[in-house]
Amino acid sequence: MTRVFVNKPQPLEARFAQERDRVQAAFGKRVREFRTEQELTLEMLAEKADLHENYVGAVERGERNLSLYNVWRLANGLGLSVADLGQDLPARKGKR
């Protein structure tokens, strides 16, 4: 049997970690804004999105780096498209 070695994920450089944190916080803020506009509790959104309420809370606090699948689940739970939910996220600094 041939062994396959996989590199361990390396920590992000500080600038990339800061950028990730900024985007996660902005995304979480949008999720919370849409949820409260619709007068949904965390529990209600979690049920609609088929996610755990603690996970949704962590997303809203900017503590989770979501998969595209979970972004899609949240968008559907809010009755939005992924594009609507991701609109107005911060632009990448210094990139065009």
Name every feature range the model reports, one short phrase each.
Residues 1-29, 33, 37-38, 43, ...:
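N-terminal flexible/basic segments that precede or flank functional cores
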Residues 36, 47, 76:
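Alpha-helical residues within the helix-turn-helix
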Residues 39-58:
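Short alpha-helical DNA-recognition segment
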Residues 51, 90-93:
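Short secondary-structure capping/turn micro-motifs that flank functional sites
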Residues 61, 87:
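Short, conserved catalytic or interaction motifs in soluble domains
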Residues 69-84:
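DNA major-groove recognition helix of helix-turn-helix/homeodomain DNA-binding modules
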